[in-house]
Amino acid sequence: MRSQFKDEHPFEKRQAEAARIAQRFKDRVPVICEKVENSDIPEIDKRKYLVPVDLTVGQFVYVIRKRIKLPSEKAIFIFVNDILPPTAALISTIYEEHKDEDGFLYVLYSGENTFGEKLAIDISSLDFSDIPDYV
């Protein structure tokens, strides 16, 4: 999915800003957070974040939930390069693995698991009786 932030700001400007941030804030990573297009979830009020390196993905999701005022019973999924990052992973680890060539980490959020990755599978209706040694 194309980033609106990338569309609005030329590569050189984004790269210079990320480099300036990295030099000035050694304990933070620059993150762009945008809603997945056509998602039924509220729009976030700001896209640019300086996230502490020791924050987990789960803690960052909490920040997003608060900013969009999402009730606790509503689901939210975040994606980095079309994958669901583990909630226990540090943002700094995700940043090192998935940062864009401009120096920003691009995070998308949605109310649906848009990219089709299975989180859990209901196996209650499956029949395993024909598998040898199945307990």
UniProtKB/Swiss-Prot annotation:
One Pfam family matching this protein: ATG8
Membrane topology value: Lipid-anchor
Effect of a null allele: Attenuates tolerance to oxidative stress when PEX1 is also deleted. Leads to hypersensitivity to ER stress and causes the loss of virulence when YSY6 is also deleted.
Site entry: Cleavage: G116, E117
GO cellular component, one term: autophagosome membrane
Mod. after translation: The C-terminal 19 residues are removed to expose Gly-116 at the C-terminus. The C-terminal Gly is then amidated with phosphatidylethanolamine by an activating system similar to that for ubiquitin.
Covalent lipidation (Phosphatidylethanolamine amidated glycine), chain numbering: G116
Molecular function terms from GO: phosphatidylethanolamine binding
UniProt keyword list: Autophagy, Cytoplasmic vesicle, Lipoprotein, Membrane, Protein transport, Transport, Ubl conjugation pathway, Vacuole
CDD domains per UniProt: Ubl_ATG8 (cd16128)
Domain of life the protein comes from: Eukaryota
PANTHER family: MICROTUBULE-ASSOCIATED PROTEINS 1A/1B LIGHT CHAIN 3-RELATED
Family statement drawn from the similarity comment of this UniProt entry: Belongs to the ATG8 family.
Protein name per the record: Autophagy-related protein 8
Organism: Candida albicans (strain SC5314 / ATCC MYA-2876) (Yeast)
